Amino acid sequence: MELRDLGKTGIKVSRLGIGTAALGRPAYINLGHAEDLQRNYNQAEMEARTHQVLEAAYAAGIRYFDTARSYGLGEQFMGNWLKTFNPKEISVGSKWGYYYVADWEIEAEVHEVKDHSLGRFQQQWLESEQHLGSHIDLYQVHSATLDSGILTNSAVHQALQELKEQKGIRIGLSLSGAQQAEVLEEAMNISIDGQRLFDAVQATYNVLETSAERMLQTAHEAGMGVIIKEAVANGRLTSRNQEEPFVSDLKQMAWKHQVGMDAIALAFVLHQDWADVVLSGASTVAHLESNVWANSVRLDQEDMDLLRAMAMVSEDYWGKRKSLSWN
């Protein structure tokens, strides 16, 4: 699999990466998540499943692995895999700023809580370091928004800069919501001693939600690494979705290229040269193997035009995402 630089971070990444939002905890908003886990939420068996997916990802050439403090036991599962499997020449990113509160309950009223305070950063960094050790290459603010306070919190900015200087770790932020572009624009203007604080950005971008494209390209041109999450829109761009009007055209294109709908969705993002790495969110080895076929898909202009025509109004996209059930 092709490797490239993650912007000017000095980190090498594969074009496809693996994210663990659906692996480290029993419930997530992906369509069919409960079926993927076969409704087996035993922690030891979930860790074994996670290791299988991570090993399959590595065998497929994936070299960027992404997790977060709020992904249940995601960091712990990945850390144990790193110790056991000892993969070579990989890069690891994690995130702080959300914490997991569901206590392994599927029907929990609240699954994660956002807190971008200095105290939360200090606590979660120690926890991330405990689980992942020296493997951490990129530490990201989880879901920065205009109202989360992170963009104006100079104490947190200074602490992030100190982490960068003391540990040699790159600093990033992930985005969510209809104002991704505005948040990124503000974040790019945050500097300490004349140096931009944030080295990389992780954003939602897919066939249905393209609103941040211009700013993501601008960030890439400015030297920031660009990581794309939710490329299959939490399962809406896979065969799990049989209801929405775009599904028929997506199915036909998948048949044309002899791959799954998921591979078409991922290929659309891989087609964007400003996207350094596109995360698979697979929770099974079979899904991962289907995702990897995206590397072989060559979309023509007709394909791209048809896919671009599927884009939704950003606010409508995020409204639909908010309505997805934890399962």
Regions found by a protein language model. Name each.
Residues 11-16, 61-64, 86-90, 133-137, ...:
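Short, well-ordered coil/turn segments that N-cap beta-strands
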